[in-house]
From Swiss-Prot:
Keywords: Endonuclease, Hydrolase, Nuclease, RNA-binding
Domain of life assignment: Bacteria
Organism, as annotated: Mycoplasma mycoides
Pfam families per the UniProt record, alphabetical: HD (PF01966), KH_1 (PF00013), RNase_Y_N (PF12072)
Domain HD: 238-331
EC annotation from Swiss-Prot or TrEMBL: 3.1.-.-
Record family assignment: Belongs to the RNase Y family.
Gene Ontology BP term (one): mRNA catabolic process
Keyword Hydrolase recorded: yes
Annotated GO MF terms: endonuclease activity; RNA binding
UniProt-recorded name of the protein: Ribonuclease Y
Phylogenetic classification of the source organism: Bacteria, Bacillati, Mycoplasmatota, Mollicutes, Mycoplasmataceae
Amino acid sequence: DLRANDLKRSQEIVESKSQRLDAGILDLEKRKFLVDQKEEYLIKLLEDVSGLTKYQAKELLIKQIKNKSEKELISILKNAELQAHSKAKIISNNILILAMERIKVELTSQRTTNIVKLPSDDLKGRIIGKDGRNMKTFEQIGGVDIVVDETPNVVVVSSFNPIRREIATRTLEQLIIDGRIQPVKIENELKKQEQELEYIIQETGLNTIKELNINDIDIELVKLIGKLKFRTSYGQNVLAHSIEVAKLSGAIASELGLDVEKAIRAGLLHDIGKAIDFEKQGSHVVLGAEIARKYNEDPIIINSIESHHEDKEKSSEIAAIVAIADSISASRPGARYNAIDEFILRMHEIEKIGNSIPGVAKTYALQSGRQIRLIVDPLVASDLDLALILEKMKEQIKNKVIIPGEITITVIREKKETDILK
């Protein structure tokens, strides 16, 4: 009986709890219903106020969040880009500083005169010669001016063409040592010194490629490199500039982990066209690319030559490095002087005009272009042609070249007969 009473009591407790649970569930359902109604009412109210449905409001909210996120992302990216640019600038500056510290820069400016020292002022009369014949021989055969003034124990060899000036200077120095100064001796010595200078040009080229550790290069290209020693541009010696660009290019390439040997070679050859641009028509860029192709240089070298003045698009990192190195070398203080180069361009133009006239073998622009000598080929032009050649030269000079003051043009036709009596 006691067990039956306990069981009955337990059943009553369970039923009581079950009833309370059912009542609670019912109450929750009523509350949920009221909340749902309230939610629908509020949504309807918001839709009426905003003019948006629930789904439209949801889309608008998502869009606003997306726009905000995009703005934040753009801001982050801009900051990262600025930091990257700043870091890249610091790195690039460090590379250039390291590259420039690793090379020795020499300031080499242009001259249009050489000074020849004399052991005695008495030699000046012998240099001038009877009726100025010796000086005229230097002008007509050598294409230079010999300036004799009151300055003690010196004479000046003047010419815008550095190769002619060097040949004439060496000739005069040798004649002073020899003691015999006369037209025939001057002419022979000029020819001899021209041959010797060709050897010096080749040796200069060989020493240059040795200094830069450049191999497998055609000997004719080596000679052109040596010829740059006697070429100037904007007052800057072209060989010195090319060596500087080569060293800078190699140093920058080394810092960037690129082909150092190719960068040095491209830097050295970037202005190779200037070895012949006073002899052939065309820009030094076009002529340089032609030279590089002729001697089977690498396409990267050719493109570096073609693109260093932005004439063509750069196809490699090496080409970009050469252009940068060229700008550094050309822009440093004291590297270039425009006025002298403009003068030289005028002198070249005068000689090109003269040489373009039929019958003219050689043209020399002397005394800053105020004296022009036209040497006529006696086998092509007769004495009767001299006046016509003179008129053609005068007309073209008037139209193409501006030279202040008076210009004296002299046309020379000379025929020599030489024989050996045995």
